[in-house]
Amino acid sequence: MDHVKLVNDPIDIAHIHQLLADEGCGASSVFVGTTRDNFQGKKVLSLAYEAYDSMALKEMNKICSDLRSKWLDLKHIVIYHRLGTVPVCEASVVIAASSPHRSEALESVSFAIDQLKTRVPIWKKEIYDGDNDSEWKENKESIRPKKSKSGFNYAACPCKVEESHDVPRTLVQIRVNDAELTKRLECFVNRKRDEINSQNVIDFKSSFVSSDQNLSDSCARTQSTIIKQEQSNCHLKVRRVNNRCGPQQMEMRPNYELELNKLMGSRDGQTDPTKEMRKSLPNSRLQAIESYMGLTTDNEENIFSRIKRVENRLLQLESISPEYRHFTKREPSSMEAAPPKKSRKKSYSAQELSAFIQKIKDGSELS
């Protein structure tokens, strides 16, 4: 039978022996943990125990189940733990077990006390004599090593790593001491805080303040105002912008593309790139393109670099402006032959077909 209990009164050891009594058992093992009077040179007056009762009892019952699954011959198991203040020389925990043979009883009690210290949520506080402050103590059994998230055993794969404290200067972005770096961080935080405060004053603080009030003591928290905007759930002003021109109005303006073509045609007539061409044909053609694209011309620069700049400019314009497709439309040159026009087939009525057939018959008879 399992006897598990948390008590606030002194534990009666004689009562524990009565719970272990059994005619079929030849051995009983009892562990009694008491309060000692010193710790690292400091005099201990008492120990104070606290526990999460429901969870502690649940874990103590699990320990009993583990003992019975490990040692099948156990008859009775007793786990008593005291809560509250426990003076020196008084029992704080008692773990006992009875079995037909001594090996099961001794081993099970040793295993149980280790599991109790590791798993059961019971906390101990040592109260010292004199001016020494009391301390909460942690059981060394409860300190669990940190497990790696990965299942790889790094200890089985030793490797030598040469540690070097010399970092190349090319990899260091900020070359200042700790004091200067801390100063920069503080200045950055203060500046962002001032920006937030000023924005809060603009958004939340009432602009109508009487003259008798001290403006230095006013703030958005004490003199805030909430003005609900019309047809809105927010007190902040919301503005809607209607773009009268641009790519967003293409659907609302059916003649937008025609107007754009006229505008770009008038613009093209204002400038004549051929006036700025030089004697060198490749250079003059590239210079005309650069002038048309709004790029600065550098004749001493490599021609491939200039072509690359023109390509980058084209990609940029195509990405930011939908109207740029106007430039990408290829118009047929005057030197090229015009594509043949598709001829539309004439449709005939039934009377016309009958007259045409009759004319063919008359011609065949005459021949």
Curated annotation (Swiss-Prot):
<feature type="binding site">
    <location>
        <begin position="101"/>
        <end position="102"/>
    </location>
    <ligand>
        <name>substrate</name>
    </ligand>
</feature>
<dbReference type="GO" id="GO:0032324">
    <property type="term" value="P:molybdopterin cofactor biosynthetic process"/>
</dbReference>
<feature type="binding site">
    <location>
        <position position="117"/>
    </location>
    <ligand>
        <name>substrate</name>
    </ligand>
</feature>
<dbReference type="Pfam" id="PF02391">
    <property type="entry name" value="MoaE"/>
</dbReference>
<comment type="subunit">
    <text>Heterotetramer; composed of 2 small (Mocs2A) and 2 large (Mocs2B) subunits. Component of the Ada2a-containing (ATAC) complex composed of at least Ada2a, Atac1, Hcf, Ada3, Gcn5, Mocs2B, Charac-14, Atac3, Atac2, NC2beta and wds.</text>
</comment>
<comment type="pathway">
    <text>Cofactor biosynthesis; molybdopterin biosynthesis.</text>
</comment>
<dbReference type="GO" id="GO:0006777">
    <property type="term" value="P:Mo-molybdopterin cofactor biosynthetic process"/>
</dbReference>
<dbReference type="GO" id="GO:0030366">
    <property type="term" value="F:molybdopterin synthase activity"/>
</dbReference>
<keyword id="KW-0808">Transferase</keyword>
<dbReference type="InterPro" id="IPR003448">
    <property type="entry name" value="Mopterin_biosynth_MoaE"/>
</dbReference>
<protein>
    <recommendedName>
        <fullName>Molybdopterin synthase catalytic subunit</fullName>
        <ecNumber>2.8.1.12</ecNumber>
    </recommendedName>
</protein>
<dbReference type="GO" id="GO:0005829">
    <property type="term" value="C:cytosol"/>
</dbReference>
<dbReference type="GO" id="GO:0006338">
    <property type="term" value="P:chromatin remodeling"/>
</dbReference>
<feature type="region of interest" description="Disordered">
    <location>
        <begin position="325"/>
        <end position="350"/>
    </location>
</feature>
<keyword id="KW-0501">Molybdenum cofactor biosynthesis</keyword>
<dbReference type="GO" id="GO:0005700">
    <property type="term" value="C:polytene chromosome"/>
</dbReference>
<dbReference type="GO" id="GO:0005634">
    <property type="term" value="C:nucleus"/>
</dbReference>
<comment type="similarity">
    <text>Belongs to the MoaE family. MOCS2B subfamily.</text>
</comment>
<feature type="binding site">
    <location>
        <begin position="124"/>
        <end position="126"/>
    </location>
    <ligand>
        <name>substrate</name>
    </ligand>
</feature>
<dbReference type="InterPro" id="IPR036563">
    <property type="entry name" value="MoaE_sf"/>
</dbReference>
<comment type="function">
    <text>Catalytic subunit of the molybdopterin synthase complex, a complex that catalyzes the conversion of precursor Z into molybdopterin. Acts by mediating the incorporation of 2 sulfur atoms from thiocarboxylated Mocs2A into precursor Z to generate a dithiolene group. Involved during biosynthesis of the molybdenum cofactor.</text>
</comment>
<keyword id="KW-0963">Cytoplasm</keyword>
<dbReference type="GO" id="GO:0140672">
    <property type="term" value="C:ATAC complex"/>
</dbReference>
<dbReference type="GO" id="GO:1990140">
    <property type="term" value="C:molybdopterin synthase complex"/>
</dbReference>
<keyword id="KW-0539">Nucleus</keyword>
<dbReference type="InterPro" id="IPR028888">
    <property type="entry name" value="MOCS2B_euk"/>
</dbReference>
